[in-house]
Curated annotation (Swiss-Prot):
Family that this chain belongs to: Belongs to the tobravirus protein 2b family.
InterPro entries associated with the record: Tobravirus_2B (IPR007935)
Entry superkingdom: Viruses
Function: May function by interacting with a small, flexible domain located at the C-terminus of the CP, forming a bridge between the virus particle and the internal surface of the vector nematode feeding apparatus.
Protein name (Swiss-Prot/TrEMBL): Protein 2b
One GO cellular component, as annotated: virion component
Further facts: The genome of this virus consists of two linear, positive, single-stranded RNAs encapsidated in separate virions. They are designated RNA-1 and RNA-2. This protein was translated from the RNA-2.
Entry keywords, A to Z: Virion
Subcellular location: Virion
Main location: virion
Length: 255
């Protein structure tokens, strides 16, 4: 606080006048102010402090008040050091330079209610546990989100690896019938991609037997399904569909 009368610092939220006419400085303005957080001074001049505040102090009650009207009671238990406990907040709107008259009616705008310390401690512990649980859940959610992102990435990669863009000459199937090799191949016919059945006549020569399926999105052949991926038309292989095909369907020319 420094030297000189502290009264020159009035008004200041941290400066109080007590029942002994001393000035008390609070480092903190909490409901309980322990001895390590307040110091006092016997001033030589109280003229900067309005007489109404000085006259408010009752010498029979250990108390102090600041310019805001915050009233603290000085408490001393046998087993504890002295401390100040906030009692409430007085309406000081009618406090002036003169002493308060004996019949002045004091009005409290707020009375401080202290709670049980053990309950406060339990509440703090519960809040701490709650925060720890929240943090744990947040960490787990973050971890799950990372796993989810990785799974989506792997799924996308798997889908990409199972996707082949349709192009002229793409072979989807080979078979051997009566000693002759047959194949199902993609051909571009009149600007349309079609599934064409071809037979090997001699060596590298293939003869077209017929164009059967227009390869557009949704078309199916054996385990192949025509799909669109990133704006491109292609095929992916569906092993589940292939395994579910019955004999009658397989005997058909195109499935």
């Amino acid at each position: 606080m420094g030297n000189g009368d502290w009264s020159s610092k009035w008004p200041n939220d941290h400066l109080f006048i007590d029942d002994f006419g001393k000035l008390v400085w609070f480092d903190v303005l909490t409901d309980i102010v322990k001895i390590s957080h307040f110091v006092s001074q016997v001033p030589t001049d109280l003229s900067p402090i309005p007489s109404s505040y000085i006259s408010f102090i009752d010498g029979r009650i250990p108390m102090c008040i600041n310019h805001l009207g915050w009233v603290y009671i000085r408490v001393k238990f046998e087993s504890e050091e002295v401390f100040y406990q906030k009692f409430g907040e007085v309406d000081v709107s009618r406090f002036g330079e003169s002493e308060l008259p004996p019949d002045f009616e004091v009005t409290f705008s707020k009375v401080t209610t202290l709670v049980n310390k053990s309950l406060v401690r339990k509440s703090e512990l519960l809040e701490k546990m709650n925060n720890e649980l929240k943090q744990e859940l947040t960490n787990k959610l973050d971890s799950l989100e990372k796993v989810n992102v990785q799974l989506k990435k792997e799924l996308s990669q798997a889908q990409q690896s199972n996707f082949t863009e349709l192009r002229d000459g793409l072979i989807l199937n080979f078979s051997k019938v009566g000693g002759r090799i047959h194949r199902m191949v993609v051909r571009s016919i009149q600007n349309q991609l079609k599934l064409v059945s071809e037979i090997n006549n001699d060596g590298d020569r293939w003869a077209t037997m017929g164009a059967t399926v227009i390869l557009k999105e949704g078309a199916q052949y054996l385990g192949f399904v025509v799909v669109k991926n990133d704006g491109k038309i292609g095929v992916k292989f569906d092993l589940t569909r292939l395994n579910s095909l019955d004999n009658q369907t397989l005997l058909a020319s195109v499935v």
